[in-house]
Amino acid sequence: MLFRSCHGYKDSHIGMLPLAKMYADMKFNILLPDLHAHGLSDGDDIQMGWKDRDDVIRWIGVADTLFADSTGRQRIVLHGVSMGAATVMNVSGENLPQSVRCFIEDCGYTSVWDEFSHQLGEQFGLPPFPLLYAASALCKLRYGWSFGEASPLAQLTGKKSQMLFIHGTSDDYVPSAMVFPLYNANPKAQTEHGGVQRFNSIWITPGCAHAKSFHDYPAEYGRHVRAFLEEKGFFQ
C-alpha cells in the first residue's frame, strides 16, 4: 500500500511529514515528492495544481515500479492538502492505472478562478473584472491554461472518483462552502435494492481554520481516514 502526498501552496514535502507518520503507522509505503516550483523540484512558477497533475501521474508510474508487491500489484491513495488537494482532484479526473484506488482532499478549492476571485475580494476589496480576466489571459498565453480551465470541480463532475472530502468550518482562505459542490459533483449510483450509494465521503471539522483539520483533530482525522480506506479495500 502506498500513500502519495500533495502539499499546499508554497509548502513542500516537509509539511506533509505529520500525515506521512499517520500513514506509516498504518503500514503504508510513503512517497513525498515536491510539486512544481516547490521544495526540491524544478520550475520557477507555481502552477496551482493544474499542470502539476501531469507530474503526479508520472510519479504514479514511478510508484508502481518501486512499490509493487511480489505479485506486481499496488494500491495507492493520493492525499492532498490545500493546493495539493486541488492537485489530487485534478488528477482524479484523468485516466489512471488501476493501482490508484482512492483520493483524499483536504480543503481544496473549486477552481483557480474561484480561489483567486475570493482572495482578490477578501484581501483587496476588488471585483474580478478587469484584473482577474487580464491575469487569466496572460496565464493562458504563458503557461497554456486559464484560471477557469484549472477546475477541480470540472474534473470531478460526472466521475466516479472514490474520494474523502475534508474541510474546516472556519476556513476563510479556501471557504468551506467550496467543499459542497465538489462533494456533490460526484454522481450517485443506485443500489440493487433501490437505495443510493455514494462513491465518496465528507467530513466537516468544527472550528478549523485553513489546513488545520489534522492539527486540531489528529485522532479523529486518523479514524476518518482509516475508515475510508477500509471501505475502499485497503488492509485486506
Locate predicted features.
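Short, small-residue-biased leader/transition segments that mark boundaries at the very start
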Residues: 1-2
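The serine-hydrolase catalytic nucleophile loop
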Residues: 9-22
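Catalytic nucleophile-loop/oxyanion-hole region of alpha/beta-hydrolase
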Residues: 12, 38-75
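Short alpha-helix in the alpha/beta-hydrolase fold that links the catalytic acid
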Residues: 19, 152, 161, 175-188
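Hydrolase active-site cap/lid region
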Residues: 90-145
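Short beta-strand/loop motif that positions the catalytic acidic residue
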Residues: 158-160, 165-167, 171
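Catalytic histidine-centered segment of alpha/beta-hydrolase-like enzymes
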Residues: 173, 208-222
